[in-house]
UniProtKB/Swiss-Prot annotation:
Acidic residues biased stretches: 91-102
Cysteine pairs bridged by disulfides in the record: 232-274, 263-308, 267-310
GO molecular function: chemoattractant activity; cytokine activity; extracellular matrix binding; fibronectin binding; growth factor activity; heparin binding; identical protein binding; neuropilin binding
Descriptive protein name: Vascular endothelial growth factor A, long form
Key words, A-Z: Angiogenesis, Cytoplasm, Developmental protein, Differentiation, Disulfide bond, Endoplasmic reticulum, Extracellular matrix, Glycoprotein, Golgi apparatus, Growth factor, Heparin-binding, Mitogen, Nucleus, Secreted
Family according to the record: Belongs to the PDGF/VEGF growth factor family.
Bias (Basic and acidic residues) ranges: 314-323
GO cellular component: adherens junction; cell surface; cytoplasm; endoplasmic reticulum; extracellular matrix; extracellular region; extracellular space; Golgi apparatus
Clinical disorder: Microvascular complications of diabetes 1: Pathological conditions that develop in numerous tissues and organs as a consequence of diabetes mellitus. They include diabetic retinopathy, diabetic nephropathy leading to end-stage renal disease, and diabetic neuropathy. Diabetic retinopathy remains the major cause of new-onset blindness among diabetic adults. It is characterized by vascular permeability and increased tissue ischemia and angiogenesis.
GO biological process, one term: positive regulation of cold-induced thermogenesis
Amino acid sequence: MTDRQTDTAPSPSYHLLPGRRRTVDAAASRGQGPEPAPGGGVEGVGARGVALKLFVQLLGCSRFGGAVVRAGEAEPSGAARSASSGREEPQPEEGEEEEEKEEERGPQWRLGARKPGSWTGEAAVCADSAPAARAPQALARASGRGGRVARRGAEESGPPHSPSRRGSASRAGPGRASETMNFLLSWVHWSLALLLYLHHAKWSQAAPMAEGGGQNHHEVVKFMDVYQRSYCHPIETLVDIFQEYPDEIEYIFKPSCVPLMRCGGCCNDEGLECVPTEESNITMQIMRIKPHQGQHIGEMSFLQHNKCECRPKKDRARQEKKSVRGKGKGQKRKRKKSRYKSWSVPCGPCSERRKHLFVQDPQTCKCSCKNTDSRCKARQLELNERTCRCDKPRR
């Protein structure tokens, strides 16, 4: 009697451990329920070892939301789960049909689940996360209530399912998972290869550009480019504002020069000069500063050259004579007056290029600068008395 009780003693995980299920089924076929082990429930060294082994299996599959079942065995039915948890739940016939359909489909493996042949030596079949979450609770309840509840659950569970389908399904699960992992690894491999190819192509295109940039320092400009750039055409030139407005010497302009399009370049002939053929005015905002009084921004108009041509040079001396000479009595009177003026004022010009910077006394023929030393110092410059310009201070 003691040996039979020991062999048929139910445990809360009898549906998870091979060898225990056969004893329970044999007792059910004889019409006898398995008697509880001495001490009631899962107690003793053997039951603790079974519980520890079950906990290790559940811990291995808990990450993936499923329970652990031995390879070749069927998943526990609803009645067996109710027996392990200490609750009686009716299982309709429709539930059995659904279980058979699930067996035909095979177990659903999650990526990263343990495969057969792992360190536990068992096949992990990850099912729904709800049974796996209830497994530790069922173990505790079954250990507390004893073998009577387990016997009742064994009688209601009925004959076990055929292990052939479950075994084949458990073998099919790892194959699908391995195919999925192989596909993902191959996809990652080809993606990395494509990135390396594109990176290499990018650097190969950048290398010739870098080499070409190094050759630009020693590049020889062609003749046609030199000729077109140097020929007579409008070019942007920085023009001093005082040169355009010589009478407004009481102001300090900011900026002191403006960019204007002016004719410039070569005509390739000494008898020709680059002159504008079309002109226009442009208005700019310039800041006018009056020392010790204030400043304001005003609009000033400047002359720009739109078109330029190379034309014969004109003799300025002859042009002046032609303008002086004329026909009629009026012109003769003007010539006489100019002669008298030249006799009465024999003073020469202070400067031929910078006449607007000097002031000449007609009686003494003394030249003085329009700019003053204080005005130049206000601009942090020094007055050059020879040129009457504000130059940078010498160091």
